[in-house]
């Protein structure tokens, strides 16, 4: 491929593709670009690309506008054509439906769930409030946020060196 053909290809690429309130890198493949979207990993991206009828190894920015729209529609309607066990929000608390949340909604939904647990004073909510581990991990020796535990050898050596210097100067 000559340099002129390479420049023509680069001019046709959209460097940013907007899907689900997120700018995706148009220079990456469809599968890898979709994986940057919150709530979409490599496996879900592969399923979405196949459902949209797009080659998942094609460059995301090189797709036509109608292909990008079909990818967007496939992301939005993921739960309709994917198995229920693949949804990231199964049996939603409020609706009882299986949903697949993408983009910034993932973090917002997570925060709402944590706040709901805090309000009803569940065990997990109390652990979240206190900043402690929630999922049953050990806390005796890991996850400490305060200063160092035990003997600080460097500080002791510095104090001894200062004491020795002070004692040596007085004699």
Curated annotation (Swiss-Prot):
MF (Gene Ontology): rRNA binding; structural constituent of ribosome
Pfam families cross-referenced by the UniProt entry: Ribosomal_S13
Similarity-based family: Belongs to the universal ribosomal protein uS13 family.
Organism: Halobacterium salinarum (strain ATCC 700922 / JCM 11081 / NRC-1)
Top-level taxon in the UniProt lineage: Archaea
Region of interest: Disordered: 128-171
Gene Ontology biological process terms, A to Z: translation
Keyword rRNA-binding: yes
Protein name: Small ribosomal subunit protein uS13
Entry keyword rRNA-binding: yes
Subunit structure: Part of the 30S ribosomal subunit. Forms a loose heterodimer with protein S19. Forms two bridges to the 50S subunit in the 70S ribosome.
